[in-house]
Amino acid sequence: GGFRGGEYPGIAAAMELGRSLDPQEIHGSLIMLHPVNIQGFWARREFIVPEDGKNLNRVFPGNPDGTLSEKTAGLISSSFFPLADFYVDLHSSDIHESLHPYVYYPGQPTEELAAKARSVAKVLNVEYMVRSMATGGAYNYAASTGLPSLLIERGGAGLCLHEDIEEYKSDLKNIMRKLGLLNEPVKPRRYIPRDVTDIIYLEAQETGCWLHHIHSGDFVEEGQVLGRPTDLFGETLTTYYAKQSGI
C-alpha cells in the first residue's frame, strides 16, 4: 500500500494487519510493503514522489538507473514480484478525490490469469469488480509477467476512517483465506461484487473549477448532468452528461 502518499486507509490497514497476524497461523509467506512512497506520505503529497515529481504507480517496470520513483518500481519489479504467487495493491481516492469502494482485476494477458484474479476478487466486500484492459500501473505490469493481481479502491479524500481500515483488513484476511494462507473458511460479507466490463472515461477539455452534480456510487440515467466546469468568475464553460445509464 501507499504508492501514493495521500491514500491512507490501505497503508493503515497493512500496518494494523501486520501487527495482529500470528506468524504461526500463516501457511506460506506474506510480504507487506507500506508505505511504498514514504516521501510523499510524510509530505502529504497527492499522486507523486516529491523528489522527482513522478507518479510511482505509472513508471513500472521501472529503471534501476533512473530517478527515485523509477528505482523504487524497478526494485519491486525485480525483487518482489518474482517471489509472489498473488499480488494485491491497496489504494483509495487521493487527497482531492472521492470514490465508491470497488476492485480492479486484470483482463490480460490470458483468460486463465484473469479468471484467477476474478475468483479472488469475489471474496471482497465491495459492490463492483472492474475488468481492466489497461497496461499501466503496478498491478497491470505484475499481471503482464503472469502474476495474478488485484487493485482495491476503498476510502480516501485525505481521510483515514476506522470503518475503512476495518473493511480493508476484513478484505485482506478473506483474500488470505481464499489463497490458503489462513486455514479457515472465507467469511460472509455484505456484498458480492458485480462484474463491470463496460467503462467510460471522461476527460475535461477545459481548465476551470469543477462543480459536480452527482456523488460517487450514484446510479445515473443516460443524458443526466454529471457536472460542469466554470471559470474563476463562475461562468459555466460546458456541461458534461452521462453517455449511458449506469453506476
Language-model-derived ranges and their functions:
Residues G1-I247:
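Structured catalytic-domain cores with a bias toward divalent-metal coordination
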